Design a protein with these regions (language model features):
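Active-site histidine-anchored catalytic micro-motif
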Residues: 1-126
C-alpha cells in the first residue's frame, strides 16, 4: 500500500504514538520534530529569509489566485522534500503491517494558510 500526499509542502510518515502531550498540544514526538526543523530549517518569518519565492514565482502565484503571503512557505517545501511525501506499507492478510506501535501520520508544514489537503492511498498487488 502506498500513502501519498499531492502537496509539495506536506509529508506522510510512519511513527509511533508518543502518548504524552507537549504544552503546545502536540504529541511530544511531533513537538520534537517541529523543534528540530525549527533549528535546521527555520519557519519563514520575513521576506528575503529564503531566496524563494522570487519575482517570477510571485507573478505565477498571482496569475493562479494565490496571495504573496502564501508564497512565503519555502520552509515547508524544504521540510517536505527532506522527509518525503509518501510511505509504502506492507499489507499482510488484509492488515497494514506497521509494527506493534507504528501509525501513519500526515504532516502539513505550510503555516501560511489553511486549506483542504488530499492524501491518496493505493493498494497494489493481490
Amino acid at each position: 500500500m502506498v500513502v501519498y500526499s499531492h502537496h509539495t509542502t506536506c509529508s506522510v510518515i510512519t511513527q509511533e504514538c508518543a502518548f504524552d502531550m507537549s504544552m503546545t498540544g502536540l504529541e511530544t514526538l511531533q513537538q520534537d520534530l517541529v523543534n528540530v526543523f525549527e533549528e535546521w530549517i527555520p519557519t519563514c518569518r520575513s521576506e528575503g529569509m529564503y531566496l524563494h519565492p522570487g519575482q517570477k514565482a510571485l507573478e505565477f502565484a498571482e496569475e493562479h489566485g494565490e496571495d504573496n503571503f502564501g508564497c512565503h512557505n519555502t520552509d515547508a517545501h524544504l521540510r517536505s522534500s527532506i522527509i518525503g511525501r509518501n510511505v509504502t506499507i506492507v499489507i499482510d492478510d488484509g492488515v497494514a503491517d506497521l509494527g506493534e506501535f507504528g501509525r501513519v501520520h500526515f504532516i502539513d508544514f505550510d503555516q501560511t494558510r489553511g486549506r483542504t489537503r488530499t492524501v491518496q492511498v493505493m493498494v497494489i498487488g493481490e
